[in-house]
Amino acid sequence: MRHISSLLQGLARSLSVGKERKGGDGDDGKAAAATATAVLRTSGTLWGEGSETFAAVCSRRGEKGINQDCSIVCEGFGCEEGSVLCGIFDGHGQWGHYVAKAVRESLPPALLRRWREAVTLAALIDGGEKRLCECRPDLWRQSYLAACAAVDAELRASRRLDAVHSGCTALSLVKHGDLLVVANVGDSRAVLATASPDDGGGARLAAVQLTVDFKPNLPQERERIMECNGRVQCLADEPGVHRVWRPDREGPGLAMSRAFGDYCVKDYGVISAPEVTHRRITAQDHFVILATDGVWDVVSNEEAVQIVASAPEREKAAKRLVEFAVRAWRRKRRGIAVDDCSAICLFFHSPPS
């Protein structure tokens, strides 16, 4: 109940300010910054003020030029003490790094604005706090869907950024009390580390994948693309790498089925709609890893969980994982340029004393 009560109080303050200001999601960015007690946009760490959460972030440039990955961690997101937003974005194409940064800056305020609207409307329709608590997951889902649609439309209308042949993936989560909401657009991945009984009567950390890697060859993705007259094919020199192609051209081919930008293939089945899932965090859940495909291409879910769990200090957990991935690239994929590798490790509880 405390989460909804304090949230509604924060919304009242925010909405009273909003009456004095008109504008779109870009203008709302200032309000979003004001409601976050701390924001981390680079490699580093961030302690959760008033909570037990702790985030470690690391990104390493690959061998393909500029690092097109970027990330954000917002503590105190949505006017709520202990609420956290994490996001990781992977650009592609000539201007992919700009697209990734644009989405990183636009998505949090767009999401916050839709969340405010959804909660306010729900309170007017059925003002009971119990009912609001019950419908929180669905409100977050609605907010994410609306926010991602708005961000993609804003990006398409932008005169400052060419996102026709460039785009980015976006994986983000909101921790709101014991509720964890995860939204995924593209092929980055979120993996939860949770305690599971082992054969010896003790406990081990198990890896639970929370997201789907949205590749074009997934049955539901391929079906949508084909219905929109797009093609899903592999190049002769890239066996196993399925790409989305326009029906009348050979390139460029997109290696994921969901993304922001990439308007050259948006009419052929590529979408920016996220898959939104949720779960309740328990005492058995230790941390969650958000990482770009540069990490997951060479590191298994189980390996990632063990690497993070075995870090001598939480501050070095993300760095340890990313550096392991870079070494794995050079060992497993010799002759292939190392991809950008980025990770966020969000710990839910204080370390044991």
Curated annotation (Swiss-Prot):
Cofactor(s) it depends on: Mg(2+); Mn(2+)
InterPro entries in UniProt: PP2C, PPM-type-like_dom_sf, PPM-type_phosphatase-like_dom
GO molecular function, one term: metal ion binding
Annotated transmembrane regions: none
GO BP: regulation of intracellular signal transduction; response to water deprivation
Xref: SUPFAM superfamilies: PP2C-like
Annotated positions binding Mn(2+) 2: D90, D293, D339
Disulfide feature: none
Keyword Zinc: no
Protein name, as recorded: Probable protein phosphatase 2C 48
Native source species: Oryza sativa subsp. japonica
